Structure formats: C-alpha cells, structure tokens
Amino acid sequence: MNIIFLQIPLKTDSISSLIVEEKTLSVIELISSGGIGGNIIMGTLALLSIYAIYILFERYSTIKKASLEDESFLKSIKNFIEQKDIQAAKTLCKNTDNPISRMIEKGIDRIDKPMTDISAAIENQGKLEVYKMENNLANLATVAGAAPMIGFLGTVIGMIVAFHEMASAGGNIDVEMLSKGIYTAMVTTVGGLIVGIIAYIAYNFLVSKVDKVIFQLEARTTEFLDLLHHNE
C-alpha cells in the first residue's frame, strides 16, 4: 500500500510536465506577422491617422483665429460711417485680419450702391470665408468613411490567406498557425475602426465650430447692414 501511495506524486509530476505554457502575442507581433499585405494595410491606416490628426489641429487653429472678435472694431466702423469717413473705415478693415472685416470691407466698397448690392457682396465674401474654414474637412470625412473599409479589406485578405494555408496544409492543419492568421486579420479591422472613429469625432467637432463662426458672421453683418440703413 505504501508503494502505491508513493507512486501517485510521480504520476502527478508527469501530468504537470505535459501542461503547455500559454503563449501570448503583442499587438506589434500580430501586426508584423500579417505579411506584406497586412503591413501595407496597417501602414496605410497609420498614415491616415496622422493625416486626420494634422487636419484636426490645423483646422482648429484656423477656425479659432476666425472666431476671435475685436469688440472695438464694429464700434469704430459705426463711428466712421456716421462721420461719413469712408476711407478711414476701409483702412480699418484692411488693417484687421479676420473674416468679418473682409466682409464689411466688401460692403463699404459698394456703399453708394443699393442695399441689395451691398448685401450680395457681403454674402459672396462670406461664402468665400466659410469655404476657407471648411477647407480639408471633406478629406477628414473621407478618412472617417474609408478607414473602416480599408481595415475590413485587410481582414478579408487575411482570412483568404489563412484559409489558403488551411487548404495547402491538407490534413496537417496547424491550429496555432490558423488562429494566429485570424488574429492578425482582425487587427486591421480594429485599426480601421479606431482611425475612423477618431476622424468622425474630429469632423463633427470642427463642423460645430464652423457653424458657430457662421452664426457670429451673420450677426455682425446684420448689425452692419442695419447701420447703413439707418444712415442712408
């Protein structure tokens, strides 16, 4: 009986020696193991993410600058208009670098024209200013839509490669190799979704900022047109 009991630990040790150590793969290893196709997809997504972040900061800086208002600007314009000093009003507009000053300058250039002409000139300049602020926003929207599709394309390519390896292996299917290929394929979808979400949020954030500036421009131009109407 003692001999039997002594043999039990030996069998336990032999079983524990058969336990396979769990293997883990880092994200970098998964990406780098995707082959040329997977690396191209992930490289493309990386470039798109950099481009999206660049547009976010560059456009935010431009829009923020356009939204800054000088409280004394319209007051000075009002004083010049009331004093019939049109040249001084033009000079002030030229020396002030913001959308509202350029729009009002267009109106002052047509100060002797009918109000409809003045309003049309201001509106046309306003459209140009909005176009400047919205520059590259369409590209950001494109990144938001294209990145997930590019990531999904990488997944499809990865799955095709994985199943091709299964077919080539015949009956000798390596489950570890197959699982690794599927993991790698799914990484491109995750990458595409991350880039797409970042670009989508950035796009809507910038659009909301542009809308706020447009509201400011409309309010200031209305004040200017009312001023001209009262001084006719």
For each predicted feature, which ranges?
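Hydrophobic membrane-targeting segments
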Residues: 8-72
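Alpha-helical membrane-interface segments at transmembrane helix boundaries
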Residues: 28-38, 123-144, 175-187
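Residue-level signature of catalytic and energy-coupling elements of molecular machines
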Residues: 35, 53, 89, 104, ...
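Residue-level signal for the membrane-embedded core of alpha-helical transmembrane segments
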Residues: 41-51, 144-150, 154-157, 189, ...
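Juxtamembrane non-transmembrane "cap" segments at the membrane-aqueous interface
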Residues: 2-17, 157-170
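Hydrophobic alpha-helical transmembrane segments of polytopic membrane proteins
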Residues: 183-202
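Predominantly long cytosolic amphipathic alpha-helical stalk/bundle segments
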Residues: 61, 66-153, 157-171, 201-232
